[in-house]
Amino acid sequence: MNFGTSRASAIENLNRFVDQNLFEYSKLRNFDYGPDNRSNISCLSPYITHGVISELEVIKKSLSKFSFSKNEKFIQEVLWRTYWKGWLELRPNVWTDYLNELKKIREEFKDNQNYRNAIEGNTNIECFNEWVKELKETNYLHNHARMWFASIWIFTLDLPWQLGAEFFMKHLYDGDAASNTLGWRWVAGIQTQGKNYLASEWNIKKFTNNRFSNIKLNENAPPKTSNKTYVASKLEFNNPQNLEEKNLLIFENNLSFEIGDFKDQKFKKIFLVSNKNENRTIELSEKLVKFKSQLIEDQKKRLEEKSIDTEIIDLSEIQNVNETSYGLYPVSYT
């Protein structure tokens, strides 16, 4: 499993998956064969998260090879990420509340040995420990393993889902505020109220080809509860028409300017905005910070090849950019 840090790598991985492995995706996608065999899934999410390739681009490529009826499950899975982003976009207080809760819970659990054992992969559950190791070493987990992991974290290890979501965001190359936060809420039973996801021994054994033993889980836990409800807000957009003398700000989740809506628009200058780890609300692993930095550098290189004046700046420097600037939407920072 190789996550190159360029748009060229993303396109290469997309083409390889569609040409060689997409035809069996629906049948094999739930199997986790381990980090050395990911041929049954696309592994494109790190690039989609950073906007290096788009969901639409991926879907169009898949439909160039197979009909919708043969391709429907893959398209559904791609669009889940789009759905979650839209859902959270309309309910931003879910993210704000999560961060506020996380701040309090961090303090409460900073000396908790159960929590330390979990993030160090030192529990009495073999598969969980292996997933912790895999997450730290590869910055990726199979989607099915993420569901099992979250369920074990919440219902067997009895740890707050907020800390688990933070642990994923710290390490995952495809860590996305929407998919990650709402996915953990869904497992806990508060995203779809009263319906939680419970990992089971038979399911883990079946879909890992019996790679693990010693899987003793709480398989009868009730869902977590929350008295908070969130109403969708109304979004309004006002795209200016004359942008020629304006600057454009591009953030780390939109790193494919050349396929975006403004690709033919001339800007005075484009600023690619990075974010130092010490300024993030969720601190990222060094490997993840490097991954993001290299993707930003690749976007800069591609823009400069088109003779577009481009500069990488830190998030804290935005205030120094003159007021005739616009940000490429959506903006996302943790």
Task: Enumerate the language-model features and the residues they cover.
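C-terminal catalytic domain of photolyase/cryptochrome flavoproteins
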Residues: 1-143, 151-314, 318-321
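Short, solvent-exposed turn/loop segments enriched in Gly/Ser/Thr/Pro and often Arg
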Residues: 147
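Short glycine-rich phosphate-binding loop at a beta-alpha junction
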Residues: 324-328
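Conserved small/polar residues in nucleotide/adenosyl-binding loops
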Residues: 333-334
